[in-house]
Amino acid sequence: MSKVIGIDLGTTNSAVAVLEGNQPKIITNPEGNRTTPSVVAFKDGEIQVGEVAKRQAITNPDTIVSIKRHMGEANYKVKVGDKEYTPQEISAMILQYIKKFSEDYLGEPVKDAVITVPAYFNDSQRQATKDAGKIAGLNVQRIINEPTASALAYGLDKGDKDEKILVYDLGGGTFDVSILQLGDGVFEVLSTNGDTHLGGDDFDNKIIDWLVAEFKKDNNIDLSKDKMAMQRLKDAAEKAKKDLSGVTQTQISLPFISAGPNGPLHLERTLTRAQFDEMTADLVAKTKIPVENALKDAKLTNADIDKVILNGGSTRTPAVQEAVKQWTGKDPDHSINPDEAVALGAAIQGGVISGDVKDVVLLDVTPLSLGIETMGGVFTKLIDRNTTIPTSKSQVFSTAADSQPAVDIHVLQGERPMAADDKTLGRFELTDIPPAPRGVPQIEVKFDIDKNGIVQVSAKDLGTGKSQNITIKSSSGLSDEEIERMKKEAEENADADEKRKEEVDLKNDVDQLLFQTDKTLKDVDGKVPEEDIKKVKDAQEALKKAQQENNLDDMKQKRDDLSKLVQDMTVKLYENAQKNQQAQGGPASGAATDAGAAQGSDDKKSDDDTINGDYKDVSDDDKK
């Protein structure tokens, strides 16, 4: 089996790792960075991903960030020009970019991947992530929870040590807490909890709101209505947040942020860590409830926890670290990089799948309860949250009315007692139930959850044996045909992007060659035959003409022709120089001098030349 890469598809940044020699290793992106911004931009018909997309976000309104926050949303689309994109398609562009530079690093095609998701992602969000992988041309071998992945990265070399660990995972857009039992190579998730709409972006927004309010107070101008100004504020807020992890105050300086009646306006503010802690205190406090719930579900107390692991870039915030220490009574473990741990753990799971990692068993859980709607709009649970997966559970129900010919199976996920308050995963109907008094027909409803946390539900009339089933699709409703179409479009875009890159490289080559040819012609003037110079000049003009006509095939041919002529002319230049030197009796080159020296020390002329050379060097030194 070929290599299985592990991908942390993050809200603000993504990372990828692969197993090498039984150890996971981060694959750096083309810019040499270990994480890649989860940013996609559309510019002049070209799709840009990562660093380059983030850099031009200020000036390009067609830049998409934090798309992960919308995964699994039924009707969410991003409009660019006259085309609309689903969150799966945008995520697929990020995955496709990661796939490409991973292939460049490994030197072989990459087909298989393990992709991580927040532990508290529901079925729709998980399915949407899997669909994004398919569109990107990846065979998603496994979807695993981010805290579980970081626990794998932490626990791989801990051997048979028996520990209970709490993973506090605060990323760019999501928050999870999981409690795991580690021992003898078994990673068992005991409980998980979280908030899929809480993360570093919210911390940034607190700074942005403060800056907007301060600027409005001073200048009576609302920057929130200026898209370009808001992008600059977002970049400045993110930088300030990072700065305050290491220093107690930071300067925010944004010149020419707006204009007033008297000319340009600048934004200058000092933000202290104490101010930042105060404005984000409610966000930090919001993470406490999931921590308490996870402990409660695992039937543990703080005293039972051996280690606390912090995961996600937002856990670098000192107030977050202090709060976690206060709540758990434990100093967080800093042995793994919070930005990289999830990708490293995903790579380990990839190694388990490919057979490269032995004696590691991962037992994950379903984050939310699953069940169906029953009479009176009640949510009847079949599988409770934090049940180890894969799992299967069935229950027998009956009809609510006499001679009821069909039952509507409304599949739900959540924790609220009433069906209307929970998340609908899907609906299907079991028909042709023989007429009978209410309560007589026996309808068995069975839930199956696979290792990826994806649900299949079936209903069977035990009297007739008739059955119906449904594999829950993402609520964003992508059919297999739509996924295939998007996959094809993604491949075509990749081909078009590659072609565009080749075109740019060719044009750069031509510009460089024309410039170099001009320089070479000046250097060789009077030193090579005129006919050779004429040939080069003619070829140069032919290339310029092809360049003006933008004929790529012709440009390639003319570039190669000119390049060969310039090389031939340069060779002649050196040959002529060598002949002239030999005619004057001097050594033609260092090699000739060595050869002369090898012929014997009684060759007085060679000795004289050597002495003269030394003498000249000394004279030069004296001049200095």
Curated annotation (Swiss-Prot):
Pfam families reported in the protein's UniProt record: HSP70
Induction summary: By stress conditions e.g. heat shock.
Low complexity: compositionally biased ranges: 581-600
Residue list for modification Phosphothreonine: T174
Top-level taxon: Bacteria
PANTHER family, A to Z: HEAT SHOCK PROTEIN 70KDA (PTHR19375)
Protein name listed in UniProt: Chaperone protein DnaK
